[in-house]
């Protein structure tokens, strides 16, 4: 065997790590989410009060997230802006679904001065989707917002309404937490 036949493959192997990044874009991190919702039975609410969660999150602890396209989870989200942020997200996992749209959410939002946004929530416990306006705010020291991520609390008073109900079932969300990470930072044409 000639020496030149051995040197060419060895040289190619030596250069492979240096050339592996050429001409390729690195993939962005995969979006992930967690949320908790406590719906209570008040007024015209026609379903039993209950808690539901995707992953595990509170205002102070982030224990588990659901990652887009892992184990059947779907997370699509955008958190864009500077100073004031627009948040758009749809999360689904098994029988759980939560969609959120918030305009102008800033770090200064408090329980006394929240920012309004829209929520649509569904699970086997609600039978059909409930939707309505909610109030979003930051509590605790860990909740925050920046381009591509948000961790925020919310309540929905007077509540979310099931529009398919003949009598208009409206149920209050007493406590809610939303965590979104690795989201898009710019609104795309499809949104």
Q: Language-model segments: which ranges?
A:
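Generic low-polarity alpha-helical segments
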Residues: 1, 55-59, 74-76, 87, ...
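Bacterial N-terminal signal peptides that target proteins for export
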Residues: 1-9
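Domain-scale selection of a single, long terminal region
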Residues: 9-12, 16
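C-terminal motif of bacterial Sec signal peptides marking the signal peptidase cleavage site
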Residues: 17-21
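An ectodomain-focused feature that recognizes extracytoplasmic/extracellular
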Residues: 23-131
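Extracellular/mature segments of secreted proteins
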Residues: 37, 51-58, 68-69, 83-91, ...
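Acidic, glycine-rich flexible loop segments
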Residues: 103-185
């Amino acid at each position: 065997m000639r020496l030149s036949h051995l040197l060419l493959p060895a040289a190619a192997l030596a250069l492979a790590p240096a050339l592996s990044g050429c001409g390729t874009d690195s993939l962005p991190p995969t979006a992930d989410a967690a949320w908790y919702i406590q719906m209570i039975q008040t007024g015209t609410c026609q379903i039993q009060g209950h808690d539901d969660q995707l992953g595990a999150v509170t205002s102070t602890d982030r224990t588990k997230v659901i990652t887009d396209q892992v184990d059947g989870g779907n997370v699509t989200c955008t958190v864009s802006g500077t100073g004031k942020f627009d948040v758009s997200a749809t999360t689904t996992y098994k029988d759980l679904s939560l969609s959120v749209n918030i305009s102008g959410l800033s770090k200064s939002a408090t329980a006394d001065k929240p920012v309004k946004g829209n929520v649509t929530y569904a699970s086997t416990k609600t039978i059909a989707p409930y939707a309505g306006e909610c109030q979003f705010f930051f509590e605790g020291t860990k909740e925050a917002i920046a381009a591509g991520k948000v961790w925020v609390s919310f309540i929905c008073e007077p509540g979310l309404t099931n529009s398919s109900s003949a009598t208009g079932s409206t149920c209050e969300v007493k406590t809610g937490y939303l965590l979104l990470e690795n989201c898009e930072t710019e609104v795309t044409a499809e949104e």
